Amino acid sequence: MRIFLLGLAACLSTLTWAAPVEQNPEAIKAQLQDYYFDAARRGDVPMLETFIESGYSLDTRDSKGYTALILAAYHGQAPAVERLLAAGADACAQDQRGNTALMGAIFKGELQIARRLMATDCSPDQRNGAGQTAAMYAGLFKRLELLDALKAKGADLNAEDPLGNSAVRLASGEIRTAAPR
């Protein structure tokens, strides 16, 4: 009986091995996106290069609207940011909250990356969903060198968000918040 069961198991495993594996296209797409976004977070330029060479859509978004460029900038991966920009990634892309790669880099204090992103053709006064600009982030986080560079690029440092905050006010430490309810 043991020999029969072993033989049956061997035959079944052979049949299973030889059977074609059905692949769910949506599952494959999700797995590729996970690899792509993980490569951006880790700064894995060779992996990003594989995606670029295969024609993968550089501005693919995750569930929060993040692109690989936004993730690479936020996580301080300068070589990945450079490679994605060189391949044509959209530097002006916004996540679901309207934040850009530049805003993420300023928030995280990634000054080299922020400078590189400021060299793109994006408007220096691009606003997020809360009405904030990159200059407001630079003012809030006291990134005065970036604030000066944004001003030189044409940013309006007196532009206000809906609460009345401007880059100039934020840089001076004046922060307006919503009234308590």
Where are the model-predicted features located?
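Alpha-helical adaptor scaffolds
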Residues: 71-74, 78-82, 86, 92-120
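Ankyrin repeat A-helix N-terminal signature
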Residues: 38-43, 71-77, 104-110, 137-143, ...
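Ankyrin repeat structural motif
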Residues: 44-52, 77-85, 110-118, 143-151, ...
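Ankyrin-repeat-protein effector appendages
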Residues: 18-36, 120, 152-181
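Intrinsically disordered, low-complexity regulatory segments in ankyrin-centric signaling systems
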Residues: 17-54, 63-66
